[in-house]
Amino acid sequence: MGYFLKLYAYVNSHSLFVWVCDRSYKRSFRPMILNKIKELSRNQFSTMSHLRKDSQPSSPGDDAMDRSGLPDLQGRFELSGKNRQYPLDALEPQPSIGDIKDIKKAAKSMLDPAHKSHFHPVTPSLVFLCFIFDGLHQALLSVGVSKRSNTVVGNENEERGTPYASRFKDMPNFIALEKSSVLRHCCDLLIGIAAGSSDKICTSSLQVQRRFKAMMASIGRLSHGESADLLISCNAESAIGWISSRPWVGELMFTLLFGDFESPLHKLRKSS
């Protein structure tokens, strides 16, 4: 009994649950645990062998067990290898961008916190980027970002091909403050990605606010530097981490840094 208690304590110290469920973890620790079993077995069976020598001759089977240093435990734990599976409603949301023809509706919908909460936390940021930068939607699809996503409504999952709210039957209009709020979120997001792990610039930090205010002043929306806060509760950190981990992040940032983009006031200036 002492042998099994020692073995249990040793294995449990390495998190038995993770060891069983994570195959890569299990493979890496298997030699260590096997060696520990052998070590404990040697200690136990050397003591037993000493007692047998004092009492009776050992049998060939006992000698074989002592030579291997590992008791024959095979067959005592005959497990099928199967595991209880998750139910069908366990699908997690994933980042998605919907269809290009609906991107304006999707961006307008993501301004609503209640609607946004049903989707993966990265989805609103991707939708806002696609709304701001023409051509980005197709580029994201080409690198594997999905159109469709599982949403969580109540305790049930449903698959959606579009992230916009059903109430928008017609194309919605954006007011200036909404557009500036989307720009602010994208500013937080892109500065966070560009800063990277070597320079911890937090989103909505003083450094980001200064740059955003300067941008708003340059396009004639000075007051929006303070008041464009409709998405202040929509933290970009999830999207920063997710995009930064993608293999295409370098190409995205290179394109944004060296691309030539028109001013957000281009249409207003042409009409005046």
Swiss-Prot record:
Segments for region (Disordered): 48-70
Alphabetical list of Pfam families matching this protein: BDV_P40
Record-linked SUPFAM superfamilies: P40 nucleoprotein
Gene3D superfamilies cross-referenced by the UniProt entry: borna disease virus nucleoprotein, domain 1 (1.10.3040.10)
Tree of life domain: Eukaryota
Miscellaneous comment text of the record: Bornavirus is a non-retroviral RNA virus that does not generate DNA forms during viral replication. Therefore, integration of EBLN-2 must have occur through a mechanism relying on an endogenous reverse transcriptase activity.
Role played: May act as an RNA-binding protein. The C-terminal region is highly homologous to the bornavirus nucleocapsid N protein that binds viral RNA and oligomerizes. The viral protein also possesses a nuclear import and a nuclear export signal. These 2 signals seem absent in EBLN-2 supporting an unrelated function in Human.
Name by which UniProt lists this protein: Endogenous Bornavirus-like nucleoprotein 2
Gene for this chain: EBLN2
